[in-house]
From Swiss-Prot:
Protein name (database record): Dihydroorotate dehydrogenase (quinone)
Encoding gene per record: pyrD
Summary of subunit composition and partner proteins: Monomer.
Binding site for FMN: 65-69, 89, 142, 175, 220, 248, 271, 300, 321-322
Entry annotated with the keyword Iron-sulfur: no
Compartment(s): Cell membrane
Length: 345
């Protein structure tokens, strides 16, 4: 039902400020989930099970982190047919993020630019929201560092968040690739990443012993990487036996949107313009890690064919964000059906 109404809703939402529209939509989804009205949103999406990271996904099409930073609308989002949901990024302490305006639509390019800056209510409130959700599907919890934490102490923030979210996560994503937190992408450097992942894997094992379950770790990386950087990241993932990698986050490049309104705004660009760059990183990663580290492909998926292209490049699962905002819930079913047809052929 909601899928058929979304084009009308989008016309109204796109007349609003982008962030205001985002918050309005999340509040509506959150209310639907809390009141049981989520059944009215329910999308008819076929099951297409896939096992990755030792987890069985209802279907291989998930929601990327960033849409629901505080985990406040999990049940409403779950009704839209996603095979898995990722919420966050969350930080140890609440923080306001960057000053507004900080989210911009580029409809001519079917893109968004955001410089949100990990605005969230902090990990304690995040955990309460996750615990309150009735959803029992695959739930990824995405963690980051506070803006005022020195980069040299970043590991402390990740370790703290990992400990807090671990009991409630199907998997945990380590976000080191947002361009909107100063110096965060430095953690993608070989030495920095090696030290961070060593600390996280040690903490993961201790938490697994404590809770009696091993929660997989995924690393989210940027598209703005050269061949040498991709190889170094791949080597580090293999060395530390990281369970998955998410490729990719938003890009700093503006090559595809030059001259468009808002193109010069600072922040990360997402949507169609990042599709090819994301696929290239996926291909390069897959060439290095093979099946040892599953890849979750995200970036510029607007159709079933786009989702299939991510899998052809080497991804095992895909996630939607900007395409979901532009096309709505119908995109989820389209992607699942396209992937299922490909596998049946």
């Amino acid at each position: 039902m909601f899928s058929s109404l979304y084009p009308l809703a989008r016309a109204s939402l796109f007349k609003m400020d982008a962030e205001d529209a985002h918050h309005l939509t999340l509040r509506a989804l959150g209310a639907a989930g809390r009141t049981g009205l989520a059944c009215a949103l329910s999308a008819r999406v076929p099951d297409a099970p896939r096992t990755v990271m030792g987890l069985t996904f209802r279907n291989p099409v998930g929601l990327a982190a960033g849409l629901d930073k505080d985990g406040a609308a999990i049940d409403g989002l779950a009704a839209l047919g996603f095979g898995f949901i990722e919420v966050g990024t969350v930080t140890p302490r609440a923080q306001p993020g960057n000053p507004r305006p900080r989210m911009f639509r580029l409809p001519q390019a079917e893109a968004l630019i955001n410089r949100m800056g990990f605005n969230n209510h902090g990990v304690d409130q995040f955990v309460k929201n996750v615990q309150a959700a009735r959803y029992r599907g695959i739930l990824g919890l995405n963690i980051g560092k506070n803006a005022d934490t020195p980069i040299e102490r970043a590991a402390d923030d990740y370790l703290y968040c990992l400990e807090r979210v671990y009991p409630f996560a199907s998997y945990v994503t380590i976000n080191i690739s947002s361009p909107n937190t100063k110096n965060l992408r430095q953690l993608q450097g070989a030495g920095e990443l090696d030290a961070l992942l060593a600390a996280l894997k040690d903490k993961q094992q201790r938490l697994a012993d404590l809770h009696g379950k091993l929660v997989p770790l995924a690393l989210k990386i940027a598209p703005d990487l050269d061949d040498e950087q991709v190889k170094a990241i791949a080597d580090t993932l293999l060395r530390h036996k990281i369970e998955a990698v998410i490729a990719t986050n938003t890009t700093l490049s503006r090559a595809a949107v030059q001259g468009l309104p808002h193109a010069d705004e600072a922040g990360g660009l997402s949507g169609r313009p990042v599709f090819d760059a994301s696929n290239e990183v996926i291909r390069k990663l897959h060439a290095e890690v093979g099946s040892a580290v599953p890849i979750i492909g995200v970036g510029g998926i607007f159709s079933g064919d786009d989702a299939r292209a991510k899998l052809a490049a080497g991804a095992s699962l895909v996630q939607l964000y900007t395409g979901f905002i532009y096309r709505g819930p119908a995109l989820v079913a389209e992607c699942v059906k396209a992937i299922a047809r490909e596998r049946a052929a």
